[in-house]
Amino acid sequence: MINGELIVDNFAGGGGASTGIELATGYSVDIAINHDPEAIKMHKANHPNTKHYCENVWAVDPVKACKGHPIGLAWFSPDCKHFSKAKGGKPKDKNIRGLAWVALRWAGLVRPRVIMLENVEEFKTWGPLNRRHHPIKSKQGRTFEKFVQQLTDLGYEVQFKELVAADYGAPTMRKRFFMIARCDGKPIVWPDPTHAPADSEEVKKGLLKPYVGAYTQLDFSLPCPSIFDTSEEIKEKYGIRAVRPLAQKTMDRIARGFIKFILNNPKPFIIQCN
């Protein structure tokens, strides 16, 4: 608890958001909810003092879970796959796309002082599906607008924006949608970036730190089989299993990266790993 207020993590997964919340506030989350037993096991290992619910988020009664305690922060990271462009043109699941509505349930029943929601940037396009379970382009964003309006009607000030993880020291350029809603009358304050490209003026002047490269998270002492080797060759050379051939889209993505970061890059990052 923070000053007597609970912290609740819906869609808690293995505990990534919970760990971030603890790093930011100094307090462990009080309640974590996830339907996956394996995810809950991992969450328990990392957050043993948290009350865990291995259930569908809709099955948990906010009033009973909170036992009369006020909520300082309720965090929501609903399933993103049925919004993400990474899913391509595959049919979407209306029920999964609608999981975010559980935030309104919590807002209406126990009124968290601050609500935060994280998802892919396409979350803003949330709208109705046609009979073939594909988004209706002419109605993109309609459901999202209703979602925001209902939070507003409940007395919340709502702001949202897209943030790039690298701007805050994470070794990834991943962009994510973030929403903050609060009902305590205090201003919503977004964090200022702490990092920028190494050749930016902000970094040159010492105002910001340079981006952290993904290579800092890689162990280059591990075997790195060629993308051109077969599964059998990799097993013989390294004694490990590997899927080959790679999917064509994966190969295309590797080719684009090679062209962008090696062939067309005046300062290519090259490392010998074998």
Q: How would you label these PLM feature ranges?
A:
Residues 6-9:
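Conserved beta-strand elements of the Class I
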Residues 41-66:
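S-adenosyl-L-methionine
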Residues 33:
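The conserved SAM/SAH-binding core of class I Rossmann-like methyltransferase domains
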Residues 36:
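Conserved SAM/SAH-binding beta-strand->alpha-helix loop
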Residues 63-73, 80-274:
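Class I S-adenosyl-L-methionine
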Residues 20-28, 46:
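A short, Lys/Arg-enriched amphipathic alpha-helix followed by its capping loop at the start of a domain
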